[in-house]
């Protein structure tokens, strides 16, 4: 039964892609490689475009131009998350229309990896139908950009510095070892940053709250292989439900990180 439901959901993604193209065309919406809007990428899982420009949010190197997400978030000061845009998501009218059209069966879209192997934006209309019906499998075969297997037993609960962090959690999407949905994230980002918001959305849907628009965008700087953090947005279709827009820091207290390579060291 679980496999049949999984295949059905995958087939419906193709029809959703067609619907989305029509909506975008009608609105004369131009979607560039650098936008954080919906990217219909279901058919290109694992594909690497020729361009090294990431499909998700990419921050220019220091001195070239200011990027609003990192500028708004500022430096890490001890909080795992900070509000962006007063907590108001940036979903477009077309994305909300898609959400209403897919409010029952759901929808998922994962941008292709860029030329450096980095993830882009992941967008979904989350419902009970997108949630998994079977236990999560192994993801150890996936090596996200900047990945290192390194441990600090005395500093980190769980010992290992890096986790394979799902942009859209398995418990929300049923997507497991999808390389377009996994980034190199610290244990702190995964547990203190992303998990509370993921559980909030999951509980909301399971308790009858209805469909939720959801987007997770890794934020890189220049050609760095490890994201500086994740921009996370959610909004329920029903008014008065769930809504947030936050930046989650990809840091680990007590550990220094070279975001260009993923190398790390103990801080004094």
Where are these predicted regions, by residue range?
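Domain-level detector of nuclease and nuclease-like folds
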Residues: 100-268
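Glycine-centered flexibility motif
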Residues: 21-23, 72, 78, 87, ...
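N-terminal Lys/Arg-rich, disordered targeting/topogenic segments
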Residues: 1-13
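Intrinsically disordered, low-complexity segments enriched in polar/charged small residues
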Residues: 10, 14-19, 35
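Intrinsic structural disorder/low-complexity segments
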Residues: 9, 44-45, 169
């Amino acid at each position: 039964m679980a496999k049949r439901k999984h295949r059905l959901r995958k087939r419906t993604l193709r029809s959703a892609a067609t619907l989305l193209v029509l909506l975008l065309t009608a609105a004369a919406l131009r979607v560039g490689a650098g936008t954080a809007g919906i990217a219909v990428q279901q058919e290109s899982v694992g594909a690497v475009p020729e361009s090294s420009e990431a499909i998700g949010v990419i921050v220019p190197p220091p001195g070239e131009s200011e990027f609003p997400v990192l500028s708004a978030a500022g430096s890490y000061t001890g909080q795992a998350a900070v509000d962006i845009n007063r907590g108001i998501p940036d979903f477009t009218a077309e994305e909300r229309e898609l959400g209403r059209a897919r409010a029952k069966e759901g929808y998922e879209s994962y941008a292709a990896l860029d030329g450096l192997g980095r993830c882009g934006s992941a967008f979904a209309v989350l419902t009970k139908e997108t949630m998994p019906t079977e236990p999560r499998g192994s993801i150890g075969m996936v090596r996200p950009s900047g990945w290192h297997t390194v441990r600090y037993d005395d500093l980190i609960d769980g010992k290992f510095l890096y986790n394979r962090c799902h942009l859209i959690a398995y418990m929300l999407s049923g997507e497991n070892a999808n390389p377009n949905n996994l980034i190199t994230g610290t244990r702190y980002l995964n547990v203190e940053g992303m998990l509370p918001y993921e559980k909030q959305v999951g509980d909301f849907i399971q308790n009858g709250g209805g469909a939720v628009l959801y987007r997770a965008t890794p934020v890189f700087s220049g050609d760095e292989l490890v994201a500086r953090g994740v921009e996370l947005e959610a909004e329920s279709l029903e008014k008065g439900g769930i809504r947030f827009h936050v930046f989650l820091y990809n840091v680990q207290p007590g550990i220094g990180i070279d975001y260009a390579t993923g190398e790390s060291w103990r801080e004094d």
